[in-house]
């Protein structure tokens, strides 16, 4: 793709998200979503092949449907309240439709089916944008309308997302699909705490983006797309493979690592709000996620898949320098000791 065209497209994606996050007018928010959607399609189809085209079409249809639902909710709200401002959604029907539309944009269960399919069909770089940047705009709107959201619907979708995110990843050998199911589970954790403590949702989003960014950058660095190619990376770059496995465990929420912090704080916050059954269920279902991460770690580090790979350890004559990677790896694995500083969230 021409660098100038790519720059314009990326700027439009950035501008669309910024318009959504900065607007207090529903029509401007809708326009921002549409700008973002139309600009992201060429990025998803950057490496043109039938899989990428199919993935882009699925993404477009899902997001366009969600945008139509959002516009319908905006019009219902306008008819009842007579105003376009985002301060409060006055009508319960509008609130429910709006929540469902934004859940579809985020990929919460039961609107999650597009996430693994689209992520698998596109390149690692496009997948990185899809699973990080594209979550910001819908989550910022949910954050702003959190007092008006129907709690039961949101919690049901959250619990189902954590369950599906863990269950779906169990059978996978494709790293992009594993990251997609992980994204669904993380979105579930964010949705569960949104009504009780929206600031904690934003903290969870920040840590999720850092971990996902680290994972995709390591995958791009090592050119890994399957568990088999990941196990072969031991011969080329043992340090990179070790860092991938540590970051994977952090995404699963293993206690000494950064990924445990948001789960711990969310369970603590839910317990403070006299909710016992919900955090217990969430903690049990999070074990599914942790299980497939640990299985991936085990199969990559302690066993080798049957292969005809007889080469010795490769010496790296050409090393790719990625300046951003070391601080991201540190942030993705060693943030847990900073948890006491977050008492400000209370």
From Swiss-Prot:
Its membrane topology: Multi-pass membrane protein
Keyword NAD found: yes
E.C. designation(s): 7.1.1.2
Cell compartment(s), UniProt: Mitochondrion inner membrane
Substrates-to-products reaction catalysed: a ubiquinone + NADH + 5 H(+)(in) = a ubiquinol + NAD(+) + 4 H(+)(out)
UniProt entry keywords in alphabetical sequence: Electron transport, Membrane, Mitochondrion, Mitochondrion inner membrane, NAD, Respiratory chain, Translocase, Transmembrane, Transmembrane helix, Transport, Ubiquinone
GO CC annotations, alphabetized: mitochondrial inner membrane
Domain of life: Eukaryota
InterPro entries reported for this sequence: Complex_I_Subunit_2, NADH_DH_su2_C, NADH_UbQ_OxRdtase_chain2, ND/Mrp_TM
Record GO biological process: mitochondrial electron transport, NADH to ubiquinone; mitochondrial respiratory chain complex I assembly
Transmembrane regions listed in the UniProt entry: 3-23, 25-45, 59-79, 96-116, 122-142, 149-169, 178-198, 200-220, 237-257, 274-294, 322-342
Enzyme class: translocase
Coiled coil start-end: none
Molecular functions (GO terms): NADH dehydrogenase (ubiquinone) activity
PANTHER family: NADH-UBIQUINONE OXIDOREDUCTASE CHAIN 2 (PTHR46552:SF1)
Similarity comment text for this entry: Belongs to the complex I subunit 2 family.
Oligomer and partners: Core subunit of respiratory chain NADH dehydrogenase (Complex I) which is composed of 45 different subunits. Interacts with TMEM242.
Function field: Core subunit of the mitochondrial membrane respiratory chain NADH dehydrogenase (Complex I) which catalyzes electron transfer from NADH through the respiratory chain, using ubiquinone as an electron acceptor. Essential for the catalytic activity and assembly of complex I.
Name under which the protein is recorded: NADH-ubiquinone oxidoreductase chain 2
Gene that this polypeptide is encoded by: MT-ND2
């Amino acid at each position: 793709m021409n660098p100038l065209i790519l720059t314009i497209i990326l700027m439009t994606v950035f501008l669309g998200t910024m318009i959504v996050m900065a607007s207090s007018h529903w029509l401007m928010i809708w326009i921002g979503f549409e700008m973002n959607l139309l600009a992201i399609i060429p990025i998803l189809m950057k490496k043109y092949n039938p899989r990428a085209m199919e993935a882009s079409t699925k993404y477009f249809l899902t997001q366009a449907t969600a945008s139509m639902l959002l516009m319908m909710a905006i019009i219902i709200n306008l008819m009842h309240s007579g105003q376009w401002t985002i301060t409060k959604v006055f009508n319960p029907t509008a609130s429910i439709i709006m929540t469902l539309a934004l859940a579809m944009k985020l990929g919460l269960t039961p609107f999650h089916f597009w996430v693994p399919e689209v992520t698998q069909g596109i390149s690692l770089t496009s997948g990185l944008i899809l699973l990080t940047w594209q979550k910001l705009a819908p989550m910022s709107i949910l954050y702003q309308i959190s007092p008006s959201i129907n709690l039961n619907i949101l919690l049901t979708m959250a619990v189902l997302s954590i369950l599906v995110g863990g269950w779906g990843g169990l059978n996978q050998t494709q790293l992009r699909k594993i990251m997609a199911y992980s994204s669904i589970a993380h979105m579930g954790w964010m949705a569960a705490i949104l009504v009780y403590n929206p600031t904690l949702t934003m903290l969870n989003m920040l840590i999720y983006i850092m971990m996902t960014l680290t994972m995709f950058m390591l995958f791009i660095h090592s050119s890994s797309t399957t568990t088999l190619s990941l196990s072969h990376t031991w011969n080329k770059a043992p340090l990179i493979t070790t860092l991938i496995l540590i970051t994977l465990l952090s995404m699963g929420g293993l206690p000494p690592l950064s990924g445990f912090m948001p789960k711990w704080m969310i369970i603590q916050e839910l317990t403070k709000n006299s909710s016992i059954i919900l955090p217990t269920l969430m903690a049990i279902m999070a074990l599914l996620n942790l299980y497939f991460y640990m299985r991936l770690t085990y199969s990559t580090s302690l066993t080798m898949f049957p292969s005809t790979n007889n080469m010795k350890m490769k010496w790296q004559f050409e090393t790719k320098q990625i300046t951003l990677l070391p601080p991201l790896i540190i942030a993705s694995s060693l943030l847990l000791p900073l948890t006491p500083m977050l008492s400000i969230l209370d």
